[in-house]
Amino acid sequence: MDQPAAAEIVNLHKTFKTGLGKPVVHAVRGVDMNIRQGEVYGLIGPNGSGKSTLMKALLGLVRPTRGSCSIFGKSSLSPDSREEVGFLPENPYFYKFLTGAETVAFYGKLCGLSGRSLKEKVRELLDLVGLSDAADRRLGGYSKGMLQRIGMAQALVQSPRLVVLDEPTAGVDPLGSRDIRNIIENRKNRGMPVFLCSHLLEQVQEVCDRVGIIFKGLLIAEGSMNELTRDSDKQEILLEHASPCLLEELKKMVREDGRAVWLEDGHPRNSL
């Protein structure tokens, strides 16, 4: 028997009333989506496109106007569906008077951990997010990137089967963004499904197996990054140790073809 999808959304509609005599706002319009076991799924779209509303419906934080959402086969409207989900909201709030270790321990206790298992989990997660050296510092002295990494730690504290991240690099500098990306890749390598909401194309390109593009509440495209960004009218050739003579010969062949056009050449660039 096939395993259920990590998360499934079927014909989701969500409207909001804005006031007496005013038209309703259609935040999400008939979206179908599934997040497979072991994949990183990225939902991308501009601000106000419906990303956060869709994510909140999946987590059972808002009730769908029509349609359904489920997590590991359980309805999102059931509190049980959230027991195995780790969630990092956009701009999470933390108690600034607590240290990093105390913060992770606080969320661990909320999830039922205690004693030695709690201490080991706190130590493990602070090491994972690169904050072992700052474990005893109060959050009031943390940078934005450090706070986001503490947010990642609290999202993982109960060893969830699914992690949901809403704009995990919001307000974070490039180095902090890379740290968070590495944490996501670490979870992916362990087979944990991740649902990532973002408005940053570069972020989803780097870590996501599949991507959905949402605009004005509609899922207008979905697929792998290769499928979504492929230009079928062009061919790309990548050569190594090609001599100038070989390149000139290739350009000559293109000119003689009559239809093909040599657009550009140069050395490929690597990400910093």
Where are these regions (language model features)?
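ABC transporter nucleotide-binding domains
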Residues: P4-A7, K14-F215, L219-A221
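Short stretches within intrinsically disordered, low-complexity N-terminal or propeptide regions
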Residues: E8-I9, W262
